[in-house]
C-alpha cells in the first residue's frame, strides 16, 4: 500500500549521484510508512472473518504466482549457467555481478530493464510474466560473457 516515484534531472553526474544516494535513505522514511487510511483498511479486514478469508485467498494466488515466476527464473538461470542468489520467495531475483552498470546498460538496449546494485543485478519477478522470467536469465548470462 505504498507508492512513490522520483525522477532526477541533473546537470552533472555528481549531482545525480548525490540525489540518488540521498533519496535511497530519505525516501524510505517517507514512503515506507503506512498511511492512516491503509492502516484503517487493514484493521477492517482483520475485524471481518469472511473478508479476511477472501483477502487470504487473493494473497495466496499472488504469492503462488510470484513463487512460480521466481522458480522459472531460478530454473532458467541454472540452465544458462547464471549464478544467482537462491530464490526463496519475494518480488526480486538477485544476481552477483562485478560490473552491474555495464551489464544493465547492455540489457537496456534489448529492452530488458534490471536494477544495477553495488555488487549485482536485481530483476523484478513481480513485474514480468513467468515466460519472461524463464527467458531473461539466458539474456543476462549472454550479456555477462
What are these regions (language model features)?
Residues 1-145:
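PLP-dependent class I/II
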Amino acid at each position: 500500500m505504498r507508492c512513490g516515484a522520483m525522477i532526477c534531472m541533473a546537470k552533472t553526474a555528481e549531482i545525480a549521484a548525490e540525489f540518488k544516494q540521498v533519496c535511497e535513505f530519505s525516501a524510505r522514511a517517507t514512503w515506507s510508512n503506512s498511511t492512516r487510511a491503509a492502516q484503517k483498511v487493514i484493521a477492517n479486514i482483520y475485524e471481518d472473518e469472511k473478508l479476511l478469508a477472501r483477502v487470504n485467498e487473493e494473497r495466496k494466488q499472488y504469492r503462488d504466482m510470484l513463487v512460480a515466476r521466481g522458480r522459472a527464473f531460478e530454473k532458467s538461470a541454472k540452465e544458462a549457467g547464471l549464478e544467482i542468489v537462491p530464490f526463496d520467495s519475494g518480488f526480486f531475483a538477485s544476481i552477483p555481478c562485478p560490473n552491474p552498470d555495464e551489464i544493465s546498460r547492455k540489457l537496456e538496449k534489448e529492452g530488458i530493464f534490471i536494477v544495477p546494485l553495488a555488487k549485482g543485478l536485481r530483476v523484478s519477478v513481480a513485474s514480468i510474466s513467468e515466460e519472461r522470467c524463464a527467458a531473461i536469465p539466458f539474456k543476462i548470462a549472454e550479456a555477462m560473457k
